[in-house]
């Protein structure tokens, strides 16, 4: 993806993040599926990525029975869909994996005629996705968000001996001066080379999406220097650990970190979580619904995709999972506490310093995974 496209896309998203509806009808007439299939829909999705009430309402409205399984990393999803015969009708990969999976023949094209609410999708997201899905033929944006970090404010203050955070808040998880102190209360990294290495590259001032082997090695070596201070590697478990006070700093998905914050508040356990948005920038991504090549309930998958693009449904899902929905009209229906939160809807200043987590070549991805596995093993 060209840097000029990246800059234009993320800035445009920031400028329209809290904008009004799309230029198409928010509630077009429903489309009839081309062919009746079974009354089932098998979904493979990220954990904590939908309001259960919207799923129940979909089942009641359509008579379609859904079954959902969950993954916590793009690597896990990719391994499943590339082997074929996954047994799923719908998945939600991230932008960094979409292009490679399309080229591998893992998905079938969508039929936009069966998605009347397609026009509600933020056009800037569609432009961003065209870099990996030319013509937007396979992927339908669902949510977009950021990779950032959160802290347990009381534990961090105690460990640092001050309530003042470093000017570059990424120092908390990458700089030995700070990680050595936070080791006592627990630091968590992503359990994903695809997500973690770009953040380390960005911290070093290098191209976050660099495929230069020396850059990738430099990023991993930097993390090796603090490996002994990292308590765990997790792409979803950090939610409950942060909420319970078992970690004091975690790198994660913005929405998941906000879920941890909400769970701690609901538990009234004295844990105070703050989701940070470092002014030096964060990673930006888009997750899209896609239909596997061997899906058995294709019409039902289209019906569900269309359902999630309804403004009221997208707003309800977005508020529940604390991520920005792809449906622009939905944003007008969300409470200001969500739309004004930079960890959910990043502002212009943050987006100007941020980067899109872009696809990697097979060779670069292989190197990243190899070095990442060595890092986790302490080698």
Residue ranges and their predicted role:
Residues 14-17:
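C-terminal motif of bacterial Sec signal peptides marking the signal peptidase cleavage site
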Residues 19-22:
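Bacterial signal peptide processing site
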Residues 27-35, 99-144, 166, 171-174:
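Hinge/lid segment of periplasmic solute-binding proteins
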Residues 27-101:
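Early extracytoplasmic/lumenal segment of secretory-pathway proteins
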Residues 108-119, 171, 267-283, 292-295:
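Short beta-strand->loop
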Residues 188-276:
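Ligand-binding pocket segment of bilobal, Venus flytrap-like solute-binding proteins
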Residues 287, 292-352:
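Mature extracytoplasmic/periplasmic domains
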Residues 348-379:
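Conserved C-terminal helix/tail region of periplasmic/extracytoplasmic solute-binding proteins
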């Amino acid at each position: 993806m060209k840097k000029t496209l990246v800059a234009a896309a993320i800035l445009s998203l920031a400028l329209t993040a809290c904008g009004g509806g799309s230029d198409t009808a928010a509630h077009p007439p429903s489309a009839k599926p081309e062919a009746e299939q079974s009354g089932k829909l098998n979904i493979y999705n990220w954990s904590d990525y939908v309001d259960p009430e919207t799923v129940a309402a979909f089942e009641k409205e359509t008579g379609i029975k859904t079954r959902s399984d969950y993954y916590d990393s793009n690597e896990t999803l990719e391994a499943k869909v590339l082997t074929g015969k996954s047994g799923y009708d719908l998945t939600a990969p991230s932008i960094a994996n979409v292009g490679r999976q399309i080229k591998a023949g893992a998905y079938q094209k969508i039929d936009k005629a069966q998605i009347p609410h397609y026009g509600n999708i933020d056009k800037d997201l569609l432009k961003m996705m065209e870099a990996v899905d030319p013509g937007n033929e396979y992927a339908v944006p669902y949510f977009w968000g950021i990779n950032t970090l959160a802290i347990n404010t009381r534990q961090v203050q105690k460990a640092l001996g001050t309530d003042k955070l470093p000017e570059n808040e990424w120092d908390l998880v990458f700089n030995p001066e700070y990680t050595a102190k936070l080791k006592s209360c627990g630091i968590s990294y992503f359990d994903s080379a695809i997500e973690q290495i770009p953040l380390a590259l960005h911290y070093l001032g290098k191209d976050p999406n660099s495929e230069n082997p020396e850059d990738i090695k430099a990023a991993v070596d930097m993390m090796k220097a603090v490996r002994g201070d990292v308590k765990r590697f997790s792409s979803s478990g950090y939610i409950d650990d942060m909420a319970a006070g078992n970690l004091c700093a975690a790198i994660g998905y913005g929405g998941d970190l906000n879920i941890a914050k909400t769970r701690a508040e609901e538990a009234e356990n004295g844990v105070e979580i703050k989701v940070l948005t470092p002014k030096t920038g964060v990673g930006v991504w888009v997750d899209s619904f896609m239909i596997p090549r061997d899906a058995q309930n294709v019409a039902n998958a289209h019906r569900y995709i269309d359902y999630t693009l309804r403004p009221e449904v997208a707003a309800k899902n977005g508020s529940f999972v604390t991520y920005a929905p792809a449906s622009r009209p939905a944003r007008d229906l969300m409470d200001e506490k969500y739309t004004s939160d930079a960890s959910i809807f990043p502002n212009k200043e943050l987006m100007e310093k941020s980067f899109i987590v872009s696809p990697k070549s097979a060779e670069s991805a292989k190197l990243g995974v190899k070095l990442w596995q060595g890092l986790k093993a302490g080698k």
